[in-house]
Amino acid sequence: MAHRIIRTLGLAAALAVIVAAAGGADLKSVAKELFAVPSTTGNEEMLAAKIRGLLPKGVAVEEAGLGTIAVKLGGAPGPTLILAALDGYGHMVSGITPEGTLTLDRAVPPPHARFDAFLLGQPVIISTAKGPVQGVVSQPAMHLLTPERRKTQVEGFSLDIADVDIGVRSEKDARAKGIELLDPVTYPAVLTELAGNQWAGPSLGVKAVAACLVSAVEALAGKTVGEETVIAWSAQTKSAARGRGVRPAIGSARARSRWQPKRAIVVDVIAAGKGDGFPFPGGGPVLVQFKSGPSDLRQAFETAAAEAGAPLQFLTAPDTPLSLPFEVPPAEVVTLALPVRFLNTPSEIVALKDLQALCEILQHFLQPGGAK
């Protein structure tokens, strides 16, 4: 763990020198900066440090354990909690072979059955105490395989056969590059700008939502918001608390215990519909409620969307691990979600007008009177 502490302190010091605050940076610039920083469950410290560096000068940042950070904005007694995730899904180094190749594992269960199979033949980045190390998940020469073997190679892929080549010949050489067990392994942060004002990239949705909260703090810092508001970036959101049945995310359970909010807004991602399916990409953020029907929070967000002139979609769906801890009367909770096409793949696609609408609605909601 010592190398993680060194990595965190070094990055935080560099950020303090290079970037003291966002200084009016637009949403797209902030999103691009956060997108470049790897952040998987248990390794959120680099993204947390980056967010600290982008927040306005004079804003006090609280720590809530496990890597969660938060900003408290003044106002009438509340609090209202705005919560987003710091961590995305990824892998970690589980072993170093005598030949210098790396084996992989996950800190948390995958979001879907095909998640690990995307690794086959792909470049990866190992974040070490000495800096990023490039590698590639090896695969046999596909042109030499029969169609049956190719199908088996893809459909039968598992982490048990994943092998990462980092261009060395021994375990000693791998460690000389800084490789240690538990180092996070992620896809390269390659952002592709698509037609129709869309972006594509790995873990793009989580980073875009985190950027939206940075933008909200920048817009509201020093102003009196409708209620005392805590804006938090939570670590450990993909790791479930102990128990039976549907279990809450550790990070959100700790956030509820720490701040005891009267109302919570979970800012999350949601899989956009396929083809013309709902929720529609480009149709605005999605307000998700556990129970159908009117509520004070729904009315407040409908008003905020109207004031912002932004589209808003509605969905009734079961609680997610992020929202579950807050579903305790008399507290209220809703999820404001960014539609993401191909969610939890190396090529998540986000419509920038959806991201902009989400931020504008959230900021109007937080203005005086918006959270009543």
Predicted segment positions?
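N-terminal hydrophobic/helix-forming segments and targeting peptides
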Residues: 5-372
